[in-house]
């Protein structure tokens, strides 16, 4: 009252503090409604700090986050994660029965600019598992280890430790290794009194997917963990932004979560500061920004399926700007 500051619409939700500078903003409950159930069911409000980094990127903030609104970049950007798909892309494999799983990813564009993508049909999460040689537990653990070593977020070492407890155990008739793994994760969490997402098909289907909260927050959930991106302009320079990565997780009842501390990255190319997968992702973005400044770049077309979240974001921004 003494300093006569203007009132600001501010809401605390799911661990976030969200602010709106509009004089007459859309009611928050209406704004968040399209994605609220996903966030609640994934227990995002139970996530706590694991690590947090701020990375300067030489690109516009919208370009930086658009790179994470589709999944088809994965085999080309991260060939170590999907070797058959990378072979198909880089070596022009003509294997006619090749199944490029990312074409089956489902995308949703929601009101107010929000969106999501998730596994969809004919993907491993939906039960379409390609036959592999050797021990399936070891093969699955090796795949997950690439994620742990490459980003230490979303999938954590403790998740692999749980998976490895299934070595030598037969998979019950009518079940699958993935289903048994999920049971083991939830059994461990129950014993530790650790909050977990709802074990429903809809919620489990979001593991490995993404929820976008307009205008600049992306949440990539997994088994009681979530990697969160927040992208912001860097001052008034349209060719620079600040890209933040939050590795979060829920904790057992007996464990006190660590206090959040920010690590400021000074060199994106330094593997001691940034792990392999975000280095690969974020290393692409400055080149994309340069391409947008090319004299030959007059217009771009967005794919109606794979890039619908990008289009939806820009349409929502256009509505705000026109208002």
What are these regions (language model features)?
Residues 1-2, 12:
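Hydrophobic, small-residue-rich alpha-helical packing segments that form membrane-like cores
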Residues 5:
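Flanking scaffold residues of small Cys/His-coordinated metal-binding clusters
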Residues 8-323:
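C-terminal catalytic domain of Rieske-type non-heme iron oxygenases
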């Amino acid at each position: 009252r003494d300093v006569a500051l203007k009132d600001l619409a501010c809401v605390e939700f799911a661990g976030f503090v969200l602010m709106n500078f509009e004089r007459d903003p859309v009611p928050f409950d209406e704004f968040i409604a399209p994605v609220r159930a996903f966030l609640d069911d994934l227990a995002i409000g139970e996530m706590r700090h694991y690590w947090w980094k701020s990375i300067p990127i030489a690109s516009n903030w919208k370009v930086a986050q658009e790179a994470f609104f589709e999944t088809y970049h994965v085999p080309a950007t991260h060939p170590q994660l999907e070797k058959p798909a990378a072979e198909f892309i880089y070596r022009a494999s003509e294997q006619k029965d090749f199944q490029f799983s990312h074409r089956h990813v489902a995308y949703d564009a929601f009101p107010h600019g929000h969106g999501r993508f998730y596994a969809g049909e004919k993907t491993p999460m939906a039960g379409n598992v390609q036959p592999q040689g050797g021990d399936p537990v070891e093969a699955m653990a090796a795949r997950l280890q690439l994620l742990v070593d490459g980003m230490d977020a979303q999938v954590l070492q403790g998740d692999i430790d749980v998976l490895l407890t299934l070595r030598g155990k037969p998979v019950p008739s009518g079940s699958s290794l993935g289903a048994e793994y999920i049971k083991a994760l939830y059994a461990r969490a129950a014993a530790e009194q650790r909050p977990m997402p709802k074990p429903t098909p809809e919620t489990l289907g979001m593991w490995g997917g993404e929820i976008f909260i307009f205008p600049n927050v992306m949440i990539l959930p997994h088994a009681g963990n979530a990697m969160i991106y927040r992208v912001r302009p860097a001052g008034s320079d349209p060719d620079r932004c600040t890209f933040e990565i939050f590795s979060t997780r829920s904790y057992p009842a007996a464990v006190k979560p660590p206090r959040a501390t920010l690590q400021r990255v000074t060199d994106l190319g330094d593997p001691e500061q940034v792990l392999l997968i975000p280095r690969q992702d974020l290393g692409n973005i400055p080149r994309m920004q340069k391409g947008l400044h090319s004299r030959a770049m007059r217009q771009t077309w967005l794919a109606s399926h794979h890039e619908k979240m990008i289009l939806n974001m820009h349409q929502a921004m256009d509505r705000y700007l026109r208002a």
